[in-house]
Amino acid sequence: MIDQLFRLLYRLAYRGMRVYWALARPRTHGALVALWSGGEILLVRNSYTPYHSLPGGYVRRRETALEAARRELLEEVGLSLGAEGLARVVDVHHGWEGKRDHVEIFEAELPERPRVRVDGREVVAAAFYPPARALALDLFPPVRQAIERRWGAAAGRGKAGLPAPGPAARSGG
């Protein structure tokens, strides 16, 4: 019952924030963590959004994006990683949902799939997905970019996992 109340409050707060973002167009800064294990990526579902994302959230005042990424990873899925295990792979500015958002995505490769835990309030699900299945989901746009970047590079593929263009396509003829 308490968890359901929290989920309702998160949804109401999110809707209110979307109105605020549309009117005020604030600058925001977020940090996310792309965890890969066995060729699969960890995605989360928040109780208040219709899409899948990576563990992460806002960068607090006087906090670096890397510190925020590590903090959010612990808060959202109960995992602690050292800073040395995370590399920034995406740094993008976008206007999705009406805000002027700066998103930094850090990536780590884990040799063994960790056990993750979710609170059932803010984060309601977390699971590892193969890239093709992940890309078929409704994703937060910077998350899609990170998956396409990693999957394409690992498989010698171009955008969205499509085969990279051959020499004739690259040269325009």
Q: Can you say where each PLM-predicted feature lies in the sequence?
A:
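Conserved Nudix-box catalytic region and its N-terminal flanking loop in Nudix hydrolases
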Residues: A31, W36-E76, G173
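Glycine-centered C-terminal helix-capping/turn motifs at helix ends
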Residues: G78-L79, F128
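A short coil-to-beta-strand element that immediately follows conserved catalytic motifs
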Residues: S80-V90
